Amino acid sequence: MEVEAVCGGAGEVEAQDSDPAPAFSKAPGSAGHYELPWVEKYRPVKLNEIVGNEDTVSRLEVFAREGNVPNIIIAGPPGTGKTTSILCLARALLGPALKDAMLELNASNDRGIDVVRNKIKMFAQQKVTLPKGRHKIIILDEADSMTDGAQQALRRTMEIYSKTTRFALACNASDKIIEPIQSRCAVLRYTKLTDAQILTRLMNVIEKERVPYTDDGLEAIIFTAQGDMRQALNNLQSTFSGFGFINSENVFKVCDEPHPLLVKEMIQHCVNANIDEAYKILAHLWHLGYSPEDIIGNIFRVCKTFQMAEYLKLEFIKEIGYTHMKIAEGVNSLLQMAGLLARLCQKTMAPVAS
């Protein structure tokens, strides 16, 4: 993956005008200073500042313009901007009344039926003066963590207070939301962010925070983020705070996952049918304490971009997939991983004449 400094454009971020607290900048690692997390400091405040998922965000912009918002469910992987999008929508709709007319709950903590009966119902009953056509908004983050009983109670509450209140649910998997709630909501789906989209935001933050970096450092951050903007910014800030410089070595010290260069070398040995050298690297990663899930995940991600014959790459990915399935089912021994390497080496060997 080649890293290009993609800056500006729709992905440009502005620091919030109403930051709850300033970020006091001192030398990285120095004690006695408070640093606002960059995830919060550079959180978008307007819908047009959100990176990625342009089609879905444009639908939210239509809701914000027209003011007639349905109940909505936003489903997608972590760190793609689901909660931020809902907050931006609420800010655009409610304006100065945001504090009084919005209730935000994290359903992974407040997940029981009592929360629906007490907090949500009491807020829905409150009278708030709003412009014509505007409604109070209740945001339920991690809504797929709610119990079935709480979701059934929420369904009834959504019906009773539909004239005054709108519900916005953010979740990772929409299939964990019961059908009656899904049928009452517009379901919007977010996908993982691309490397270029993450790079755009990283470059903007790097410029504002004056972070020294190398291209391989940015490549490492994007590799470890896996389409998650929150993780990318957290890894960037953690590496800068700990080392003051962004390069691949420092990033992998912070993220601590199997180094892709080692994994790449291991795959190269498999392509060369050198099982002994490949196993040495696997055993080294195993004894460093990495879980089989971490190792197999990185083998797959490195293999996708590895330069080899296309037919061979397809065979490799098929074997990696089978092994990943066995590991997920609980068969996660070193022997299982060694068997994968043996099968990969076998794919590259010329058949023995009988």
From Swiss-Prot:
Q: Where is this region: Disordered?
A: 1-29
Q: Record's superkingdom?
A: Eukaryota
Q: Does the keyword Nucleus apply?
A: yes
- Residues bearing N6-acetyllysine are K163, K304
InterPro entries noted in UniProt: AAA+_ATPase, ATPase_AAA_core, DNA_pol3_clamp-load_cplx_C, DNA_Rep/Repair_Clamp_Loader, P-loop_NTPase, Rep_factorC_C, RFC_lid
Record GO terms (molecular function): ATP binding; ATP hydrolysis activity; DNA binding; enzyme binding
Location in or out of the cell: Nucleus
The residues the record assigns to binding ATP are: G76, P77, P78, G79, T80, G81, K82, T83
Tell me the residues on which Phosphoserine occurs: S18, S30
Instruction: Report the protein name in the record.
Output: Replication factor C subunit 2
The species this protein belongs to is Homo sapiens
Q: Which gene encodes it?
A: RFC2
